[in-house]
Structure formats: structure tokens, C-alpha cells
Amino acid sequence: METIQAIILGIVQGLTEFLPVSSSGHLQLAKELLGVDPEVGGLTFDLTLHAATVLSTIVVLWSEIKRLVVGLFSKRFNAEQAYVLKIILSMIPVVIVGFTLEPFLQSLVEDLPNHGILLLVGTMLLVTAVLLTFAYYAKPRHKATISYRDAF
């Protein structure tokens, strides 16, 4: 992989990470468009890009993260502890679905040739587009707070 390709892929990752689209999917598409061999760099390169994204997110949101961490160690139950608990609660369905579907998805991806993976990524991006369209036209809910049920 050439340096310019790595820079372009980093820009794609940075631009798409905070949009309601799949940054990993766009990364795969960008690799294909740039003619980058998926095996070159592979998982290490993708992990490096995502680690850089996490680091930049921590830098940007440092004051909020610091407030939550300090609030976690309060002796009395407070808003920060409730918020962190809701974040953890919101991860439970994703973990369950992820661990349940992981063997199936792993075998699916391993059996697909490169163009098949690209087709899968494209299909998932279309599914995301449909879900975002439904969310856009759905009746908005105006809630001041997130309940534990909403978090789950």
C-alpha cells in the first residue's frame, strides 16, 4: 500500500466514522476503488485506523469523559453513574446479537471471494440507507431523558 492510499483511506475513515453510515463499509469500498489489495495491511491497518479514531474521539470529548469518570467514583448514585449504566445496558443487545451471529457471518465472509465481500458491503450500505430513510420520516419522539428501557 502506498502512502497516498493510506492517507486517503484515513480521510475516508475520519469523514465517515461520525456519520450514521458504516465507516468500515466505506473503507472496504475505498480500498476497492483505490486498487488496494485487501490482504496488504489487512486487519492491522484497519485496527490502526480505528484506534486513531478512538484516540481522536477521546481528545475531542475529553471534558465529558472526565466528568463521567469522576462521577463514577462518587459515593452517592448520581447522573453520571446512571448515564454510564445506560451506556453499558445499551451494549447488551449488540453483544448478544454479535456473539450469536459471529460464527455464521465468519463462515459467510470466508466463503466469499473479494467481489462477494464488496457485494455484501454494498448490500449492507443499502440496508443502512433504508433504515435511515425510515428514521428520517418516522414520527419524532421528544424526550428529555433516556430511560433504562430506552437504553436497552
Question: What are the residue ranges of the model-derived segments?
Answer:
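Multi-pass membrane proteins that catalyze or facilitate reactions on polyprenyl-/lipid-phosphate substrates
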Residues: M1-F152
